[in-house]
């Protein structure tokens, strides 16, 4: 990465020295609280039989939250110090480690988003054939592979940065010569941004094309069923992937502009650099907001963290289990085998059977639109 990333142009009393700590403090607090709540939601124990098993999407979201939390905890405070202070105060080891963690977590996030997009594509395009592949065990193996690849791609950054003396000050700056730095920065853009974004775009694009490829009324009904099958989780992960592309795009564009364009050192270019970093770092605190807004399932699980939410959920599932105990096991009305009943109908006991004291007969009765 370019030298300009790690040399502050502002003095401690300037506007930048005041604004940067405030912006980074907000990113730090929101990211810690938001991703901490995501971990709490996904790691909450299953005290009863109605707790659903952890899905592959849950495991990938959990991995994203871990990567974001590591980034915010280990990187954001030190980057704020780089922008605020005139010198690097933490030594050569921390200088190398912080920048290694920045790229390690960036690669982990981008590769995880690519894995999620492929998982969603298989779930929609090949729901039956991919069932044996899309298991929690294989998802954990995929997460391990993501971190292994992230470690391999980010390993060069352990020697990329170092500390140098500049008069009486010690600075944390790139230590490689320009040719090697340019090659690594371009490789990081290609492998850590361009390739994952291309995979995500292709996977979600093919998924959407498949969902909307309906011919005739039967095809439209099948497409609608498939769209419902994707659920809000798929839309939430699509929003997360789009946010990643939008937040990290200016950061990589600025680096490429530095190497291949005209990048004069000025307050304007410094402001662009600062804005691109703030936008990239803010990506780690925006994902929990997307989950809470786009996923009704996530909000329901979040409410279970609190005593009142657990009581409501337990009461709901007790009623659901009671209904299932009286539900026929094998047949429904003509044309709706098993439990495949049309929306707007419910299983209810006939009132005359209850009044007569005889055997309860279950019939389908209209509930009205939902």
UniProtKB/Swiss-Prot annotation:
SUPFAM superfamilies: Family A G protein-coupled receptor-like (SSF81321). It is a multi-pass membrane protein. Residues 1-20, 79-96, 160-184, 258-259 are extracellular. Pfam families: 7tm_1. The keyword Lipoprotein applies. Disulfide bonds join 95-172. The chain crosses the membrane at residues 21-41, 58-78, 97-118, 139-159, 185-205, 237-257, 260-280. Keywords: Cell membrane, Disulfide bond, G-protein coupled receptor, Glycoprotein, Lipoprotein, Membrane, Palmitate, Receptor, Transducer, Transmembrane, Transmembrane helix. GO terms for biological process: adenylate cyclase-modulating G protein-coupled receptor signaling pathway; G protein-coupled receptor signaling pathway, coupled to cyclic nucleotide second messenger; galanin-activated signaling pathway; neuropeptide signaling pathway; positive regulation of transcription by RNA polymerase II. A lipid is attached at residue 308 (S-palmitoyl cysteine). Residues 317-370 are annotated as: Disordered. It comes from the Eukaryota. Residues 42-57, 119-138, 206-236, 281-370 are cytoplasmic. GO terms for cellular component: cilium; non-motile cilium; plasma membrane. InterPro entries: Galanin_rcpt, Galnin_3_rcpt, GPCR_Rhodpsn, GPCR_Rhodpsn_7TM. The keyword DNA-binding does not apply. GO terms for molecular function: galanin receptor activity; peptide hormone binding. It is found in: Cell membrane. Glycans are attached at residue 6. Belongs to the G-protein coupled receptor 1 family. PANTHER family: GALANIN RECEPTOR 3, LEUCOKININ RECEPTOR-RELATED. Receptor for the hormone galanin and spexin-1. This is Galanin receptor type 3.
């Amino acid at each position: 990465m370019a030298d300009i990333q790690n040399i502050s142009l502002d003095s401690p009393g300037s506007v930048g020295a005041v604004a940067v700590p405030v912006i980074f403090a907000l990113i730090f607090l929101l990211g810690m609280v938001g991703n901490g709540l995501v971990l709490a939601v996904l790691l909450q124990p299953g005290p009863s039989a109605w707790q659903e098993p952890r899905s592959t999407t849950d495991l990938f979201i959990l991995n994203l939250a871990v990567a974001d939390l590591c980034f915010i905890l280990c990187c954001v405070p030190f980057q704020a110090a780089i922008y605020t202070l005139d010198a690097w105060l933490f030594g050569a080891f921390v200088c190398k480690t912080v920048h290694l963690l920045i790229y390690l977590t960036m690669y982990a996030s981008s590769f995880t988003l690519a894995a999620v997009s492929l998982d969603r594509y298989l779930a929609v395009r090949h729901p039956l054939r991919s069932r044996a592949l899309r298991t929690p065990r294989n998802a954990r193996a995929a997460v391990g592979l993501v971190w292994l690849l992230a470690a391999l791609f980010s390993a060069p950054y352990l020697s990329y940065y170092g500390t140098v003396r500049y008069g009486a000050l010690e600075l944390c700056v790139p230590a490689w010569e320009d040719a090697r730095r340019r090659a690594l920065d371009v490789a990081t853009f290609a492998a850590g941004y361009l390739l994952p974004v291309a995979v995500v775009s292709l996977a979600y694009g093919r998924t959407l094309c498949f969902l909307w490829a309906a011919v005739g009324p039967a095809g439209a009904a099948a497409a609608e069923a498939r769209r419902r099958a994707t659920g809000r989780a798929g839309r939430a992960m699509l929003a997360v992937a789009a946010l990643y592309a939008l937040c990290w795009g200016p950061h990589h564009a600025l680096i490429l502009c530095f190497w291949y364009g005209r990048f004069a050192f000025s307050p304007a270019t410094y402001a662009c650099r600062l804005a691109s970093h703030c936008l990239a770092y803010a990506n780690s605190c925006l994902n929990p907001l997307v989950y809470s807004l786009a996923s009704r399932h996530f909000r329901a699980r979040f409410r279970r963290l609190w005593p009142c939410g657990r009581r409501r959920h337990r009461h709901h599932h007790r009623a659901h289990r009671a209904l299932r105990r009286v539900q026929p096991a094998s047949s429904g009305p003509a044309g709706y085998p098993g439990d495949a009943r049309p929306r707007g109908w419910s299983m209810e006991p006939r009132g005359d059977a209850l009044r007569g004291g005889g055997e309860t007969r279950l019939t389908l009765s209209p509930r009205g639109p939902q």
